[in-house]
C-alpha cells in the first residue's frame, strides 16, 4: 500500500515522502497513529501544494536575509555605543549581543535576533569592531560596532 508520511518514522520514511509499505503496517500502525495517510490522488495533490508553499516561504526568508545583509553591509550602518572607560582603556562594563541587537533596532530599525550574532565574548575595548552574524543558513553578514568613550 502506498502512503504519504506525515512525520518521520525511523527506518521507514521521512515527512512528505511517498512510499510503498505492507498493508498491515500501514493500517495498524502508520494510519492509526496518524504518522501517514493513504497516497490517494487527492492527498498527493495536497502534499504537492504544501511542498510548494514551504518552498515559497523558504525563498522569502532567504530573500529577507539577503536584503538585511545588504543593509548591514552599507557603510552608513555602524552601531554606535558610548560607554564609561576605566584608566586602563577598557570598558567598565561590556557590550553584549543583546545590546547590539537592541541598538540595531533603535538606530536603524533593523531587527536581528541576538542569537544570530556570533559574538564569542562581549566587547570590552573601545574602537571599531566587526561582529559576525549568521542571518540564514546560506547568508552571513558583518555588523560594524563602534564603541567610544563617554564624556
Swiss-Prot record:
Single GO MF descriptor: rRNA binding
Keyword Ribonucleoprotein: yes
Alphabetic keyword roster: Ribonucleoprotein, Ribosomal protein, RNA-binding, rRNA-binding
GO CC annotation: ribonucleoprotein complex; ribosome
Lipoprotein in keyword set: no
Gene Ontology biological process terms in this record: translation
Name of the protein: Large ribosomal subunit protein bL9
